[in-house]
From Swiss-Prot:
It comes from Synechococcus sp. (strain CC9311). Residues 1-23 form the signal peptide. One of its GO terms (molecular function) is serine-type endopeptidase inhibitor activity. It comes from the Bacteria. This is Putative ecotin-like protein. Belongs to the protease inhibitor I11 (ecotin) family. Keywords: Signal.
Length: 173
């Protein structure tokens, strides 16, 4: 190795050594059964290091947070009203996986649409349609992955809900 190599390598090593070490957690899916035929596995690994909120009304405690699972499809939109129809998300506790759960939609998810004649000049676009009207919320837990099996062609999206710190009184009747 020549002196030129050291001149090039030394600054790179110093930069790498000064960067904070970040451990990348391994995704442990032991204890989960294989997806049933026709289903695809989707996995969410919530981070234990979410950015802190500047809003004092938002709880900083993960015990007050929830993960919303959003099952849906990206569909071509036109002048017709479209929505998804299919079985709702179900949860199955896994005894061999100590407290972990498997979520699943176990049937076909269909796009229902009105059948109006659309103007050919009208703009078309894609939109994500979600299955079901009510949010499907589960406790936030950075220790376990969220495992969801869905029919082919269906996607999973998610977001975190955080509770307010203040509690409000109800009216007693």
């Amino acid at each position: 190795m020549g002196l030129g190599f050291l001149r090039l390598a030394l600054p790179l090593l110093m930069v790498a050594a000064s960067a904070p070490a970040v451990a990348i957690p391994r995704l442990d899916l032991s204890g989960y059964p294989a997806p049933k035929q026709g289903l695809k596995r989707w996995v969410i690994q919530p981070s234990g290091l979410l950015p802190k909120s500047d809003d004092a009304l938002i709880s900083p405690h993960p015990l007050d947070w929830r993960v919303q699972l959003i099952v849906g499809k990206e569909v071509e939109m036109d002048c017709n009203v479209k929505r998804l129809s299919g079985p709702s998300l179900s949860m199955q506790r896994l005894p061999q996986a100590s407290g972990k759960a498997l979520f699943e939609v176990s049937g076909p998810v269909l796009v229902l649409s009105t059948r109006m004649a659309c103007n050919s000049e009208q703009a078309k676009g894609k939109s994500f349609l979600s299955l079901g009207k009510q949010p499907y919320l589960i406790p936030y837990n950075a220790s376990w992955p969220v495992v969801v099996d869905l029919p082919d062609g269906v996607e999973l999206r998610w977001r975190v809900w955080k509770a307010e710190t203040r509690q409000q009184e109800a009216v007693r009747l």
